[in-house]
Amino acid sequence: MQELKRAREIIDDVSKETDSILLFHSLSGKDSIVLLDLCYKKFKRVVVVFMYIVKDLEHIMRYYNYAKTKYPNIEFVQVPHYALFYDIKTGYMGIKQDPKQRQWTLADITEKLRKRLGVEWACYGFKQSDSLNRRLMLRSYTDGKEAINWKTKKFYPLSTYKNKEIMDYILDHRLKNPEANGTNKQSSGVDVEDIEYQKFLLLQ
C-alpha cells in the first residue's frame, strides 16, 4: 500500500529526531486506532492524549482497556477538550455558564502538555480528506510528504490517507474496530452530538 509506506516514512523521519511523542487520540475513532498502531512500534515513549468532553464514557473506556493491553508501554493522560471551554463560556445546551471561562485552542493544549511532560513532538490524525481547511494546511508543509511541520514539531502520518484505506489497515492488522453509534456512523471518539454527551449537558 502506497499510503502505508508513506505514513511509515513520515514516522521514520520524526523518529530520527526524537524517541518521545504526544499522540492526540480520540479513543475509538478509526484514524486514532491506526495512528497508535503505527507509532507505538517506532517511539520509546508514546503519551496518548485524550481530550474529553465527558469523562469515562462506556465506549471510550472499552477502547482504553483494549489499548492498555495491546500497547502496554503507552502513557495516558486526559485533558478537557477545547470545545468544552467554549460550551462553558456560552452556556451551550444548558450547561452551567461561566462568561469568564478562558478559551483554549488545540495549540494551547499542546503547548501546556509539552511543558508539563517534557515532550516536544506532537502527532495528530488529521487527513487531507477530512476538510478543505485541513487539506490546505497539510499541503502548505514543505517536507515533501505534506505531513511534517519541522518548525512547530507537529506531524500528521495519515495526511494522504482516505477513509477506505484506514479501514483496510484496521482489517489487515486485526485491530479493534471503531465503535458505531445508533445511526451506524463510526465513532470519531468524542462527538458533541453523542446522546451520552447530550444527557450530560441536561444534568448540568
Model-derived segments and spans:
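Nucleotide-activated chemistry modules centered on ATP-dependent adenylation/adenylyltransferase
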Residues: 1-204
